[in-house]
Amino acid sequence: MLERLNFIENKYEELSNKISDPSVMANQKEWQKLCKEHADLEIIVNTYREYKKAQEDLESDKEMLKEESDKELREMAQEEIKELTLKLEDLERELTILLLPKDPNDDKDVFIEIRAGAGGEEAALFASNLLRMYTRYAERKNWKVETISLNATDIGGFKEVTVAVKGKGAYSRLKYESGVHRVQRVPDTESSGRIHTSTATVAVLPEVDDVDININANDLRIDVYRASGHGGQCVNTTDSAVRITHLPTGLVVTCQDEKSQLKNKEKAMKVLKARLFEAAEAERAASIAEDRKSQVGTGDRSERIRTYNYPQGRITDHRIGLTLYKLETFLDGDIDEAIEALVTEDQAEKMKNLGRVN
């Protein structure tokens, strides 16, 4: 590990020199790329330097303990040795996590697709609850949310809805939300007071760059139509809504949020690219991982990941066995406690897999 850290520190110094070079700065695209690489290494280098300083201080205290006869100074050195030993253990653990393979999509913006599952109108209302939860969470993170497309019901639910979430680290946090979410509650329409179980499916897709995936224009069928709102009524007098069908896969994407047909087409293309990229990544991951599945979950849309139990005010994440009794605040966007636990479990699994490889 130390050899790798030394290499990273040297690379960081090299990048520091490059990004301050006027000839490099003249090429803005290259300069921005180097700046990002420099910023990505900064936290590792700073932690490593703190680790080296703590090691030096520890050796110094050990030397002092060998040579010093004064009782008070010896006790002081022993106390410092104890503190520094613990600090070094913490820093070593932190460095191990920092050196884990990074998901290249973590810094990307995302598309969240929510679809009502089993449960009819109640499932559509639950899909609406999930959209509100993610919107509130995005507000807490100062992320921007844009509606791409929606298919609303008459009483305020969503058969399906797609939104874009833009902000630093959006995918790194929201990627754990992919899967089947289950709700247990008494529907407003239920006169007998029986608890019903409904589901909604969430897919979180990273927004991909043009270089990440190439789409042949001949593989697309593009249809335009008038946008509709709640209950199906027309909300636009022009054919501004866009439906794109990817003929080889049968994937269909719609966008009607913008008044401009061109903007709707651009947004729909971004979602299509994200879906095709996700499909390609899933295929690649399956071939690499074979039968091995992450404890945190595969992110498969068919995997039941979380239950929201209204009578008990309980949320249970089935991937890691986490139970929280804070349903109201959770649905208001306070989901970081669950996400942090999932991140920690994911890191532990990666470290375990790294050990298998090594």
Curated annotation (Swiss-Prot):
It comes from Clostridium botulinum (strain Loch Maree / Type A3). The modification N5-methylglutamine is found at Q233. GO terms for cellular component: cytoplasm. Its main location: cytoplasm. Peptide chain release factor 1 directs the termination of translation in response to the peptide chain termination codons UAG and UAA. Belongs to the prokaryotic/mitochondrial release factor family. It comes from the Bacteria. InterPro entries: PCRF, Pep_chain_release_fac_I, Pep_chain_release_fac_I_sf, Prokaryotic/Mito_RF, RF-1. It is found in: Cytoplasm. This is Peptide chain release factor 1. Methylated by PrmC. Methylation increases the termination efficiency of RF1. HAMAP family: Rel_fac_1.
